[in-house]
Amino acid sequence: MHEYEHTQPGTFMRAMTGLWVVIFVVGSVVMLALGGQEVAGAVIPGIVMLAVFTAIIVALFHSLTVRISRSDIALSFGVGLIRKRFPIGDIRSVRTVRNRWYNGWGIRKIRGGWLYNVSGFDAIEIQLKNERKYRIGTDQPKKLFAAVESALAGSS
């Protein structure tokens, strides 16, 4: 049973993907209109490969789900192929933080640890007993912080 579960949509990722789709569709139509069949034969395979690549990235990173149980914090991106778990017993501390804009989104090595994020700048930072730090992006920093604190108190 989960004591906390929340899925944050990757709003920025979705918006940027939509923008890229529009740009590629308009660009493709213009190139086909100006270049005819010769251009179509050269351009369409590239467009299809780019569309497939974009679809894979969106499927993998369109959201971040955080589940907290008595035993662990479980993260999963998008369709669930990319996951990470943190046993509650391994966590030393938790605090709310605000990421800088240049930390970006996705899974990133940042100064002092790792970041797991799909949208926005708010996060919690957990420090493990082995001194490693991880930031988990969220649009519910207070609720997520309270849920982790509750799980930590329950494990003591």
PLM segments and residue spans:
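Short hydrophobic/aromatic segments of transmembrane alpha-helices and their interfaces
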Residues: 49, 56-57, 127
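Hydrophobic alpha-helical transmembrane segments
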Residues: 38-49
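N-terminal membrane-targeting/pre-transmembrane regions
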Residues: 1-39, 115, 121-123, 133, ...
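Non-transmembrane, membrane-adjacent beta-strand/coil modules in membrane-associated proteins
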Residues: 60, 76-140
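Structural signal for membrane-spanning alpha-helices in multi-pass inner-membrane proteins
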Residues: 27-31, 53-60
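Transmembrane-cytosolic junction motif
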Residues: 56-72, 76
